[in-house]
Structure formats: structure tokens, C-alpha cells
């Protein structure tokens, strides 16, 4: 970086007052009273640049404060036939100041995945008061439990994730507490199917979950519904019969049960 030398005393002696000088500092130009050297702009050639040094009463060095004056039009005895216009300013400033491109960095999805995920533990029963239990390593069934068997009920870890949420639809995932299992929706035999999928606990849960794991939770009075985000109008459902697997159905409001009561165990 070039260093502006300190002006000699005899040069400073020839300075005069100019109340309209602008001083360019780190926080922007400021107008203030200062002592400046009287220079004849008419002696400058077209396109030349003059450095006007300001000598302040403050404790400022020449390196901190320099006024730049651009000779934009040479005074002439006869008035110019062409007025100075905006295009002339553009050409002068483009010559002095170099434009640099601004590079915008795209957001890395990893930061979204690493964001804290809000979760809560809960239990679900369908509107017929059937509880959801594990029947085998990868199957959920709905059945009525006696008081002594209530410990068999599955405890879900419901996580709030990204999705096309609205006022009454909240995107969530449903994992089983104590298991590396999540409910997910896949296509089998040309039919959307509900399954329990093994997951890597080091990667899940995360804010940006794959769509097959996401359900839109809708509250209707005191009950909730879970609609597949991947397959709209397909809901987590139970049969009216006892001990039948929990499945993904599209007969909402008919023979299949899509309404559940939710017991929150922890926020």
C-alpha cells in the first residue's frame, strides 16, 4: 500500500481555508472546516486527478485523512458548447473506480441438517381406544390392552421437521423410542405402503428429513391425523378389527380409522 508522506511546513503555510471540503474516513465522508491548499484547477489537464491534503486541528495523520478532487472539466475562456452530463460522470468514475463482482455463496444443506430438532415423546391410540404395539421387529399392530399390559404400548418420538407446513398441517416424523426405527412410506406393488425402516442414529433425526419419513399432523378437535407427505391423501390408519397391522390407507372417513388421540409424555 502506498504511503502519503507528511507535508512540509513551507507547503502547509500556503494553505487556505475552505469550508466545503469533504473528508473521507473509514466510516464515510464528513463535511468539516479544514485548511487546504489553494490550487488552480484550470492548470490541470483534462482527466487529471488532484490530491488535496487536509490539515486538521485534531490528532489525525495524513494517512488517516485525504481528500480526492477529480478535475472533471477544464475551465476555458469560452463556454463549452456541450454541457457536462451524467454520461460524463459515469465515464470518469468508471475510469477511477474499478468494479468488482460480488460472489454469493450458496447455503450448505449440512447446516440445515445439523440444526437442532424439536421433539417430544407421545403415545397414540385410535378413536376405538386401540393401542399401538410392536408385533415383530418391523410391524405395528393396533389392539385393546388390559391395564397390566399398557407397558407394551409404543412410545413415539415425534420430531418437528421441514416441510410445506400451513396453519393446520405440521410436518413431523415418528420414530420409536429406544429403537432405530422410523415410520416411512414407500411404493410396493403400485400401492403406497407404511413400513418401519431402520435408520442410522448418527444421521437421524434431522431438520431436512427425506420425504418418505414426513407426515403432516392435523389436529381435528381432540384428535390428530397423519397424512403422508410423499403420498397426499394417504393416512396412517388402523382397521376396526382387532390385532391388525397399522397401514397406510386412503379411505378417510369410511371403514378405516385415521383419527388418533395423542398422549404427550414429555415436551
UniProtKB/Swiss-Prot annotation:
- PROSITE patterns per record: INTERLEUKIN_1
Q: Which domain of life is it from?
A: Eukaryota
Q: List the disulfide bonds.
A: none
InterPro entries xrefs: IL-1_CS (IPR020877), IL-1_fam (IPR000975), IL-1_propep (IPR003502), IL1/FGF (IPR008996)
Q: Where in the cell is it found?
A: Cytoplasm, Cytosol; Secreted; Lysosome; Secreted, Extracellular exosome
Q: Which CDD domains match?
A: beta-trefoil_IL1B (cd23296)
Q: Per the UniProt entry, what are the Gene Ontology biological process annotations, in alphabetical order?
A: cellular response to lipopolysaccharide; cytokine-mediated signaling pathway; fever generation; immune response; inflammatory response; positive regulation of canonical NF-kappaB signal transduction; positive regulation of cell division; positive regulation of estradiol secretion
- The record places the site described as Important for interaction with integrin at 169, 177, 179, 188, 202
- Propeptide positions: the record gives 1-114
PANTHER family with a match to the protein in the record: INTERLEUKIN-1 BETA (PTHR10078:SF30), INTERLEUKIN-1 FAMILY MEMBER (PTHR10078)
Other remarks in the entry: IL1B production occurs in 2 steps, each being controlled by different stimuli. First, inflammatory signals, such as LPS, stimulate the synthesis and promote the accumulation of cytosolic stores of pro-IL1B (priming). Then additional signals are required for inflammasome assembly, leading to CASP1 activation, pro-IL1B processing and eventually secretion of the active cytokine. IL1B processing and secretion are temporarily associated.
What task does this protein carry out? Potent pro-inflammatory cytokine. Initially discovered as the major endogenous pyrogen, induces prostaglandin synthesis, neutrophil influx and activation, T-cell activation and cytokine production, B-cell activation and antibody production, and fibroblast proliferation and collagen production. Promotes Th17 differentiation of T-cells. Synergizes with IL12/interleukin-12 to induce IFNG synthesis from T-helper 1 (Th1) cells. Plays a role in angiogenesis by inducing VEGF production synergistically with TNF and IL6.
Q: How does it assemble?
A: (Microbial infection) Interacts with African swine fever virus (ASFV) protein L83L. Monomer. In its precursor form, weakly interacts with full-length MEFV; the mature cytokine does not interact at all. Interacts with integrins ITGAV:ITGBV and ITGA5:ITGB1; integrin-binding is required for IL1B signaling. Interacts with cargo receptor TMED10; the interaction is direct and is required for the secretion of IL1B mature form. Interacts with HSP90AB1; the interaction facilitates cargo translocation into the ERGIC. Interacts with HSP90B1; the interaction facilitates cargo translocation into the ERGIC.
Family, per entry: Belongs to the IL-1 family.
This protein is called: Interleukin-1 beta
Q: What is the originating organism of this protein?
A: Sus scrofa
The organism that produces this protein has a lineage beginning with: Eukaryota, Metazoa, Chordata, Craniata, Vertebrata
Q: Which gene carries the instructions for this protein?
A: IL1B
